[in-house]
UniProtKB/Swiss-Prot annotation:
Enzyme class label: lyase
Gene Ontology terms: biological process: formaldehyde catabolic process
Co-factor(s): Zn(2+)
UniProt-listed PROSITE patterns: CENP_V_GFA (PS51891)
Protein name from the UniProt record: Glutathione-dependent formaldehyde-activating enzyme
Keywords: Lyase, Metal-binding, Zinc
Residues of the CENP-V/GFA domain: 20-167
Lineage, highest ranks first: Bacteria, Pseudomonadati, Pseudomonadota, Alphaproteobacteria, Hyphomicrobiales
Family: Belongs to the Gfa family.
Source organism of the structure: Rhodopseudomonas palustris (strain BisB18)
GO molecular function: S-(hydroxymethyl)glutathione synthase activity; zinc ion binding
UniProt xrefs under NCBIfam families: formald_GSH, PRK05417.1
């Protein structure tokens, strides 16, 4: 039996073009869809097992990446957007009608990822954005209802797809967080 991760990777991870210049994210509404413009390619694209990220029906993981916040512009029907949870670190701006998360923004200027917005590359009208590179917060899928006995098969499938599974972020991103924290502590001393 094949373990389903996410429709964007279940048939294999499709590599990006290497020259993706950006595009338009579109929500799932047929009438007046929300459209968000993204300049440039995505970074740190990954499968995410956390329970906060939006994912399509039937997906075990979301697929999420980051872009500089200055590269994100609401193009159409922004009146349909609302923040899902105002108390969350990542302010997820979702369509009120279909529920699709269009972008997530960190407003806390001291957060290591401040200045980066989180997006779901599968929502691009255009193809060619950078491919998912790893899987983060893998154990968290248990919180969304996955039986713990399925975890070895899920981790094996992620590895088969070339998405190294982590129960936090990738080592490079964890290093970036630790570096940011260390710098802030040096300033405080």
């Amino acid at each position: 039996m094949t373990v389903h991760i996410h429709p964007a990777v279940d048939q294999g991870v499709k590599q990006g073009s290497g020259s993706f210049a950006g595009g338009t994210l579109v929500c799932k509404c047929q009438d007046r869809p929300v459209k968000v413009g993204i300049k440039g390619d995505v970074a740190h694209n990954h499968a995410c097992g956390c329970t906060k990220c939006w994912k399509p029906d039937g997906a075990t993981f979301s697929v999420v990446a980051v872009v500089p916040r200055d590269n994100v512009t609401v193009l159409e029907n922004g009146d349909k957007l609302h923040v899902v949870d105002a108390s969350a670190t990542i302010q997820r701006h979702a369509c009120k009608v279909c529920g699709t998360h269009m972008y997530g923004r960190i407003e806390n200027k001291s957060h290591p990822f401040y200045g980066l917005d989180f997006i779901h590359p599968e929502l691009f009208q255009e193809g060619g954005s950078a491919a998912p590179e790893f899987a983060a917060f893998v154990s968290s899928v248990i919180e969304s209802g996955v039986d713990p006995s399925e975890m070895p098969g899920i981790r094996a499938r992620l590895k088969e797809l070339g998405l190294e599974p982590y129960d936090c972020l990738s080592p490079g991103l964890m290093d970036a967080i630790a570096t940011s924290v260390a710098k802030s502590q040096q300033k405080a001393a």
